[in-house]
Amino acid sequence: MSGYKNNNLVKLCIMGDGGVGKTAVTIQFISNHFVHYYDPTIEDSYRKQCVIDDQVYMLDILDTAGQDELTAMRDQWIRSCEGFVLVYSVTSRSSFDQIAFFKEQINRVLDSDDVPIMMIGNKSDLDDERQVTYQEGKDLARCFGMSFMEVSAKTRSNIEEVFNETVRCVKRKYDLHNKDKSKDGKDIKKKNSIIKKLNQKVNNTKNSICKMM
């Protein structure tokens, strides 16, 4: 969580199969326009300042490639980020099936199941071409403990909400982490205080015995 602690900089990683519209989602959020055609991404980084729940954040967004041969690079991307947006296309059953692979990779690289992840089904405007229902997406997200939304990079539907909610997930984890650290610190102080009192009682008992002798 080092980035979040640094002036509310939040590092997010966009992951998913090739062709699902990761770049279109990112550019729509950053620049408020829809890109129809673009070269396949290997790695692009974007920054945007935004206000979420009356708090100013600087989002550092890493748009990544979906190709299998870039797995080693993807490990590096994962290590550098705090929150994740996993993208599939509602018009592609295979991209939906790949979500489990990306989720497992994140958990493996970070060695944790407690990672802020938002799963999104892009291209919700193409309902006639839909292969994955909203309920299927919702059920998978619930199974994996992820937040979920359907979006459209073309119409901008839910684009702002996706990034806002992902930042909230990162913040909740950071706040909980700090709360746990504070609790641990208080528990240690309490334990040390008890030990100190016990030692004082032992010493007092020893002194009493010595005086009696």
Curated annotation (Swiss-Prot):
GO terms for molecular function: G protein activity; GDP binding; GTP binding; GTPase activity. Its main location: membrane. GTP binds at residues 16-23, 63-67, 122-125. One of its GO terms (cellular component) is plasma membrane. It catalyses: GTP + H2O = GDP + phosphate + H(+). The modification Cysteine methyl ester is found at residue 210. It is found in: Cell membrane. Residues 211-213 form a propeptide. A motif (Effector region) lies at residues 38-46. It comes from the Eukaryota. Its EC number is 3.6.5.2. Keywords: Cell membrane, GTP-binding, Hydrolase, Lipoprotein, Membrane, Methylation, Nucleotide-binding, Prenylation. SUPFAM superfamilies: P-loop containing nucleoside triphosphate hydrolases. It is a lipid-anchor. A lipid is attached at residue 210 (S-geranylgeranyl cysteine). GO terms for biological process: macropinocytosis; signal transduction. It holds the Pfam family Ras. Belongs to the small GTPase superfamily. Ras family. Ras proteins bind GDP/GTP and possess intrinsic GTPase activity. PANTHER family: RAS, DI-RAS, AND RHEB FAMILY MEMBERS OF SMALL GTPASE SUPERFAMILY. This is Ras-like protein rasX. It comes from Dictyostelium discoideum (Social amoeba). The gene is rasX.
